[in-house]
Curated annotation (Swiss-Prot):
The organism's taxonomic lineage, starting at the top: Bacteria, Pseudomonadati, Pseudomonadota, Gammaproteobacteria, Enterobacterales
Species assigned in the record: Salmonella typhimurium (strain LT2 / SGSC1412 / ATCC 700720)
Official protein name in the record: [Ribosomal protein bS18]-alanine N-acetyltransferase
Subcellular compartments: Cytoplasm
Active site, renumbered: 103 (proton acceptor), 115 (proton donor)
Major enzyme class: transferase
Span of domain N-acetyltransferase: 2-147
HAMAP family to which the protein is assigned, alphabetical: RimI
EC number: 2.3.1.266
Molecular function terms from GO: protein-N-terminal-alanine acetyltransferase activity
Residues annotated for acetyl-CoA binding in this entry: 69-71, 77-82, 108
Keywords (A to Z) from UniProt: Acyltransferase, Cytoplasm, Transferase
C-alpha cells in the first residue's frame, strides 16, 4: 500500500539517499537539508514500508515552487511520481495556491511528458542552466494554474 505524508526531519536521511540515487547531479547536502521549514510543503511517498519518493515545495503567499522531486530508482516506472504530484497539487489547492512552478532539464522527456499530462505549460527557458557531463543544458520553466 502506498501512503503520502509530510516529510519530517527524521525522514531526511532516507530522502537524502534517494536524492543521491535518483539524480545524476544531486543537490549538495547543505542545499538539501536547508530546504525545510515553515514555508515548505515537503512530502514523502511510502511504498512497501519504504520511502520511495519525496517532493520539496516552497509556498509563498499564493504561489508554490516545486524545487525537487525524486523517485527511488527501485520504484520508478510505477506511477509513484504522478501519485505524489497529484497529491501535492490537491494539497496546494486546499491552501489557496493559484500557481505551481517548476523547472526541468530539457533532456528529461519523461518528466516533461508527466508535467504536461498534469496540465503544466512551458513558461520560459533558462539557457545553459543545468550542469551536464559535457557542459550545460537548458532548464524549462513550467507553470500549472491550480485555482483562482
Amino acid at each position: 500500500m502506498n501512503t503520502i505524508s509530510i516529510l519530517s526531519t527524521t525522514d531526511l536521511p532516507a530522502a537524502w539517499q534517494i536524492e543521491q540515487r535518483a539524480h545524476a547531479f544531486p543537490w549538495s547536502e547543505k542545499t538539501f537539508f536547508g530546504n525545510q521549514g515553515e514555508r515548505y510543503l515537503n512530502l514523502k511517498l511510502t511504498a512497501d514500508d519504504r520511502m520511495a519518493a519525496f517532493a520539496i515545495t516552497q509556498v509563498v503567499l499564493d504561489e508554490a515552487t516545486l524545487f525537487n522531486i525524486a523517485v527511488d530508482p527501485d520504484f520508478q516506472r510505477r506511477g509513484l511520481g504522478r501519485m505524489l504530484l497529484e497529491h501535492l497539487i490537491d494539497e496546494l489547492e486546499t491552501r489557496g495556491v493559484v500557481t505551481l512552478w517548476l523547472e526541468v532539464r530539457a533532456s528529461n522527456a519523461a518528466a516533461i511528458a508527466l508535467y504536461e499530462s498534469l496540465g503544466f505549460n512551458e513558461a520560459t527557458i533558462r539557457r545553459n542552466y543545468y550542469p551536464t557531463a559535457q557542459g550545460h543544458e537548458d532548464a524549462i520553466i513550467m507553470a500549472l494554474p491550480i485555482s483562482m
